[in-house]
């Protein structure tokens, strides 16, 4: 991972399913030029792997707290990850 590129594995909890959170995440990530994926989890949370320029990753982590209209985010937990794990582009996956 280069100095200006980073990746984060993120778990978002709250009312984040049934509110187009994955579509919103993909749109925001593409707008910010991030690579990675997002998926719903069976416990009602959403998990995402985001990778790209440090500033863009930081902005996306901030955006997760707001989410799309209808979402009510309770927590955004992130940990550093390897950017090599992120596919090129951004996609919605299934858990």
Curated annotation (Swiss-Prot):
Listed GO MF terms: acylphosphatase activity
Top-rank taxon, per record: Bacteria
Low complexity bias spans: 76-88
Enzyme Commission no: 3.6.1.7
Active-site residues per Swiss-Prot or TrEMBL entry: 22, 40
Reactions it catalyzes: an acyl phosphate + H2O = a carboxylate + phosphate + H(+)
Domain Acylphosphatase-like: 7-94
Signal peptide: none
Pfam annotation, one family: Acylphosphatase
UniProt keyword Protein biosynthesis, yes or no: no
Family: Belongs to the acylphosphatase family.
Name the record gives this protein: Acylphosphatase
Lineage: Bacteria, Pseudomonadati, Pseudomonadota, Alphaproteobacteria, Hyphomicrobiales
